[in-house]
Amino acid sequence: MLRLDLQFFASKKGVGSTKNGRDSIAKRLGAKRADGQFVTGGSILYRQRGTKIYPGLNVGRGGDDTLYAKVDGIVRFERMGRDRKKVSVYPVVKEA
């Protein structure tokens, strides 16, 4: 009688999809104007999530916490105490 020697080797059968392999798009947060720079009213100064930087003089805060200039002037990033920062816009005085 013939003996048949069958051997089955380990093999990878089904290939599932991976759960990684995706990345979210960047939100472009951060400073949009530098300290000492001249800005016009309505210019965006800082895009943020939450209040990393607080609005100072002549600066408004939008619904998504974006800081914007209310008047034309010079941008100043300042400290409020030890651990808080604020951004202000100081109007330029025109000489006649």
From Swiss-Prot:
Propeptide ranges are 1-9
The record's HAMAP family line, in alphabetical order, gives: Ribosomal_bL27 (MF_00539)
Instruction: Report keywords, A-Z.
Output: Ribonucleoprotein, Ribosomal protein
Q: Establish whether keyword Transmembrane is in the entry.
A: no
Q: Which organism is it from?
A: Anoxybacillus flavithermus (strain DSM 21510 / WK1)
Has keyword Acyltransferase? Answer: no
Q: What name has this protein been given in UniProt?
A: Large ribosomal subunit protein bL27
The family classification in the record reads: Belongs to the bacterial ribosomal protein bL27 family.
Against InterPro entries, the record matches this protein to:
Ribosomal_bL27, Ribosomal_bL27_CS
Q: How is it modified after translation?
A: The N-terminus is cleaved by ribosomal processing cysteine protease Prp.
Signal peptide range in chain numbering: none
- PROSITE patterns, alphabetized: RIBOSOMAL_L27
**What's an example of a GO molecular-function annotation for this chain?**
structural constituent of ribosome
Matching entries from Gene3D superfamilies are given as:
2.40.50.100
Example GO BP: translation
Single GO cellular component term? cytosolic large ribosomal subunit
